Regions:
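N-terminal strand-loop-strand
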Residues: 1-24, 28-29, 50-55, 74-76
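Nudix hydrolase/Nudix homology domain
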Residues: 18-22, 84-128
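Hydrophobic alpha-helical positions that pack around
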Residues: 25, 39, 43
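Glycine-rich phosphate/ribose-binding loops and adjacent secondary-structure elements
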Residues: 31-35
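A broad structural signal for short, well-ordered beta-strand segments within beta-sheet-rich domains
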Residues: 51, 68, 76, 88-90
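Hydrophobic/anchoring residues in structured secondary elements
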Residues: 56-59, 93
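Active-site-adjacent beta-strand/loop module that shapes the phosphate/pyrophosphate-binding cleft
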Residues: 60-83
Length: 128
């Protein structure tokens, strides 16, 4: 889930990830929950950031457990971040320039084998 606000995107460092390793937020859909509501709930649970508009971006088959990853773009309604400390241990906003600089300095962004990196690259390459 690519959460954005005023030209910045919200990325997180998940428990067990190396310092400087950021990725988009992710989660699961609950029983009888819409995909859009799942995005809003997961972002709020992991970062405390409320989300408004949610837009589909892309999907990817995922082998475990015979699942699918669905990429969404979401608009944050606030900037203040409060990480849950369980799944997410750090989260911060990045401008496109900061994200490109982070990646150039060997900072890790997303997983090469997942939709996560596709979503980030798509956002980085958009004209501003």
């Amino acid at each position: 889930m690519l959460v954005e606000n005023q030209g910045r995107c919200l990325l997180a460092r998940h428990r067990g990830s190396a310092v400087g390793s950021y990725s988009t937020l992710a989660g699961f859909v609950g029983v009888c929950e819409s995909l859009e509501d799942a995005v809003r709930r997961e972002v709020a649970e992991e970062t405390g950031v409320p989300v408004g508009t949610v837009t589909y971006m892309a999907s990817q088959g995922w082998p475990f457990p015979s699942g699918v990853m669905i990429g969404f773009r979401a608009t944050a309604l606030a900037e203040t971040v409060h990480v849950d400390g369980e799944e997410v241990v750090e989260a911060r906003w990045f401008t496109r320039a900061e994200l490109a600089e982070h990646a150039a300095a060997a900072g890790r962004l997303g997983r090469e084998d997942s939709i996560d990196l596709y979503v980030l690259r798509s956002w980085l390459e958009e004209p501003t």
